[in-house]
From Swiss-Prot:
Family: Belongs to the MICOS complex subunit Mic60 family.
Name of the featured protein: MICOS complex subunit MIC60
Mitochondrial matrix domain ranges by topology: 25-40
InterPro entries in the cross-refs: MIC60 (IPR019133)
A family per Pfam: Mitofilin
Recorded GO CC terms: MICOS complex
Leader peptide range in chain numbering: none
Coiled-coil portions: 313-335
Upper taxonomic lineage: Eukaryota, Fungi, Dikarya, Ascomycota, Saccharomycotina
Range annotated as the organelle transit peptide: 1-24
Species name: Lachancea thermotolerans (strain ATCC 56472 / CBS 6340 / NRRL Y-8284)
């Protein structure tokens, strides 16, 4: 046992040495630490290594898969596991029960079996016999209390990147152990937990040492770098100052030369401009003097001409006034004659239009030529204010424009045509008077049949039935009273009014044209 413990200590020392060498290799490039910190670091690394091996051996004994992984990948792991198993076997052999104790424990079982006959056992006798036997001593084996091993993960050690791989490897081992869900005795669990706690403390101490060393190294390097940077900055500033001074002097000299050149050019251009201005002023004064002389000469000449005119041509002014008065009188007479002629032509034209509209021809009337002549005469009529100077349009212009819009390129029905169309409508109107309200097809057929038996009225009856209205309209058309005829037709209602709609439009158009011609005639006669 002493040999095994010595071997374990040697293995631990070897692992500590290798861990120290690995740690020193990992943290390559760090500044050299002081002796006391190095010894602390070695102690902590040794404790962490011991805790790692103790936890690995414990888990290997309880989990075969982890044991194979631990023995295959970790140096000296297999020998440590074998040493611990030998130590455990020796302890178990020392605690085994002797032969006498086994006989005392299990001997009474044979006595009970021998007492039972082969033919079977009577329940009553067996119970009495068993009750008479002395009670056997109960031997209890105390079960060891098992605890589930659950190790927490090691947290990342701040912002130290060099300790991160070590922490990640420890966390990977912890995760593998936690996945096995091992059940350990309480003392073993406490030992593993204490070792893991020491491992975490050692990792934290390593992290603190690394941070301290890094901070000191950074401070030293920062001071040296600041000093070097300050010196280089002063050197560059001096060289830059010399360069800027030389550049400024060069630019100043160039600007000075350019300014002198520009000033010389401006002075020369100013002198030239002043010279030209003086020459122009002199020429202007000479021209002004010559103009004054010409004006004086013209004035003298006009005075001489006025004197000559007053002497010999004094009567020409009176003759000129008489000629102007005669010209004005001739213009007035010409205007009156022209106006009279235009008015007479307009009067004749209106009479022609009236006769054309009231003619008894059976053909339609077209007055486009008369309208063109009417517009020409209205345009040349003297004495009318111009359209651009008058705010309100003249009656003559309004009448002519309305006539042009109504009759231009249009055919106007004569009185004979209106009468003939009305005669054609009489039969339909008489038939429509027989239609009931909202008549259908049967109503129209019945009205058409009974219409053949109707008698037409003649003359000017005073009744208000449809036959009397038809008779009065025909009488008014024969007497050329178109306005009264249209008034009678417009008063109709219902289907008769719908039948006469086209006739009413043509009659109204003719009445409007006749009214406009009458208004034009009145305006011409009043002019």
């Amino acid at each position: 046992m002493l040999r095994s413990r010595a071997t374990i200590n040697c293995v631990k020392s070897g692992r500590a040495g290798r861990a120290l060498s690995r740690g020193m290799a990992t943290f390559e490039g760090q500044p050299a630490a002081r002796p006391n910190r190095l010894s602390k670091l070695l102690v902590r690394v040794g404790l962490a290594t011991v805790g790692f091996y103790v936890g690995g051996v414990t888990l290997s004994l309880n989990n075969d898969q982890f044991g194979e992984l631990f023995c295959d990948n970790v140096p000296l792991a297999e020998s440590l596991v074998e040493m611990y198993e030998e130590f455990r076997d020796e302890k178990m052999q020392a605690s085994r029960m002797s032969l006498d104790e086994l006989k005392q424990k299990f001997g009474e079982l044979g006595t009970k079996v021998d007492r039972i006959p082969n033919r079977g056992a009577d329940p009553a006798l067996t119970s009495q016999a068993v009750a008479a036997l002395p009670a056997s001593k109960e031997v209890r084996l105390e079960d060891e209390s098992l605890v589930k091993l659950r190790l927490p993960e090691v947290e990342q050690l701040g912002s130290c990147k060099r300790a991160t791989p070590l922490v990640e490897s420890v966390n990977a081992a912890v995760a593998a152990v936690n996945e096995q869900s091992l059940l350990l005795p309480e003392d073993t669990y406490n030992a593993v937990h204490d070792a893991f706690t020491k491992l975490k403390s050692a990792l934290q101490a390593i992290n603190e040492d690394i941070r301290t060393n890094v901070a000191e190294s950074v401070a030293v390097q920062y001071g040296q770098a600041s000093k070097d940077l300050h010196e280089s900055f002063e050197i560059r500033a001096k060289s830059r100052e010399v360069e800027l001074t030389q550049q400024f002097l060069n630019e100043f000299n160039a600007f000075k030369a350019q300014l002198e050149k520009h000033s010389s050019e401006e002075l020369a251009s100013a002198l030239k401009a002043n010279e030209q201005a003086l020459l122009a002023k002199q020429s202007n004064e000479v021209a002004l003097l010559s103009m004054k002389q010409v004006e004086e000469f013209t004035k003298i000449l006009s005075e001489k001409l006025d004197q000559e005119r007053q002497g010999r041509l004094s009567k020409l002014e009176a003759l000129n006034g008489s000629v102007q008065e005669l010209a004005e009188a001739v213009d007035q007479v010409d205007t009156l004659v022209m106006k009279s002629e235009v008015l007479s032509q307009l009067s004749l034209l209106t009479t022609l239009l009236k006769n054309k509209l009231h003619a008894g021809d059976e053909s339609s009337v077209k007055i486009d030529s008369e309208l063109a002549r009417l517009k020409t005469l209205c345009d040349i009529l003297p004495g009318r204010p111009s359209k651009c100077c008058s705010k309100n349009p003249q009656l003559l212009d309004v009448v002519v424009s309305q006539l042009d819009s109504l009759a231009s390129q249009q055919l106007i029905l004569s009185n004979e045509q209106l009468y003939n169309r009305w005669t054609l409508l009489q039969k339909d109107l008489s038939t429509s008077s027989l239609l009931p309200p909202n008549a259908g097809i049967l109503g129209h057929i019945s009205a058409k049949i009974f219409g053949f038996f109707l008698f037409n009225k003649n003359g000017a009856p005073v009744d208000n039935d449809i036959d009397s209205v038809i008779a009065r309209v025909g009488q008014n058309l024969r007497l050329s009273k178109l306005d009264k005829a249209v008034e009678e037709v417009v008063a109709l209602k219902g289907w008769p009014r719908v039948l006469c709609d086209e006739w009413v439009q043509e009659a109204r158009k003719k009445l409007e044209i006749e009214t406009l011609i009458d208004a034009l005639d009145c305006e011409i006669r009043s002019s």
